[in-house]
Amino acid sequence: MEAIAKYDFKATADDELSFKRGDILKVLNEECDQNWYKAELNGKDGFIPKNYIEMKPHPWFFGKIPRAKAEEMLSKQRHDGAFLIRESESAPGDFSLSVKFGNDVQHFKVLRDGAGKYFLWVVKFNSLNELVDYHRSTSVSRNQQIFLRDIEQVPQQPTYVQALFDFDPQEDGELGFRRGDFIHVMDNSDPNWWKGACHGQTGMFPRNYVTPVNRNV
């Protein structure tokens, strides 16, 4: 996940990370502390105050969604190349790319070099966003021609929904909320589980726990 710095921050401890307003940081872990994230900038990593940054979620980033749930979602897509990026279940801090091709869903480990650059094969990138954009026109596979395409959205997707009930996450990658909360819908291509953002967090939530609202909040 990427974030943009809203203010300058000067580290005051060895495990903190300094940055300037406007810097794009790679957030490595959002669960270290209630007020601090672990992030990386220019090959260095450390802790940063969460209120100094603004998260920049991409519609293709699904966080800690389990591999099985990724396969379930992508198998319902109609076109090859439909994809998502998720946090690796087996290697915390790493990422996996899941892509639909034919009747299968293929998974690629997103590798990183010593400088923190991302890659699948040879070409390296400063961010996941750059990697995704490159593989929209260059195959992610060496065995088939698979080009990344955004997950198909259902037409007239509601921008916001409101929670009808409290929901406490049962698995990694799910989004918790309280009754009455407004949730920004990021993907509703699955009939049962939608992706959304609430209180600065993103994740999956059950469709039958919410109701559409006809205004922005």
From Swiss-Prot:
The modification N6-acetyllysine is found at K6, K50, K109. There is a cross-link at K109 (Glycyl lysine isopeptide (Lys-Gly) (interchain with G-Cter in ubiquitin)). GO terms for cellular component: cell cortex; cell-cell junction; centrosome; COP9 signalosome; cytoplasm; cytosol; endosome; extracellular exosome. It holds the Pfam family SH3_1. The modification N-acetylmethionine is found at M1. The modification Phosphothreonine is found at T211. It comes from the Eukaryota. Residues 60-152 form the SH2 domain. Residues 1-58, 156-215 form the SH3 domain. It is found in: Nucleus; Cytoplasm; Endosome; Golgi apparatus. SUPFAM superfamilies: SH2 domain (SSF55550), SH3-domain (SSF50044). The modification Phosphotyrosine is found at Y209. Its main location: nucleus. Homodimer. Associates (via SH2 domain) with activated EGF and PDGF receptors (tyrosine phosphorylated). Interacts with PDGFRA (tyrosine phosphorylated); the interaction may be indirect. Also associates to other cellular Tyr-phosphorylated proteins such as SIT1, IRS1, IRS2, IRS4, SHC and LNK; probably via the concerted action of both its SH2 and SH3 domains. It also seems to interact with RAS in the signaling pathway leading to DNA synthesis. Interacts with SOS1. Forms a complex with MUC1 and SOS1, through interaction of the SH3 domains with SOS1 and the SH2 domain with phosphorylated MUC1. (Microbial infection) Interacts (via SH3 domain) with hepatitis E virus/HEV ORF3 protein. The SH3 domains mediate interaction with RALGPS1 and SHB. Non-enzymatic adapter protein that plays a pivotal role in precisely regulated signaling cascades from cell surface receptors to cellular responses, including signaling transduction and gene expression. Thus, participates in many biological processes including regulation of innate and adaptive immunity, autophagy, DNA repair or necroptosis. Controls signaling complexes at the T-cell antigen receptor to facilitate the activation, differentiation, and function of T-cells. This is Growth factor receptor-bound protein 2. It comes from Homo sapiens (Human).
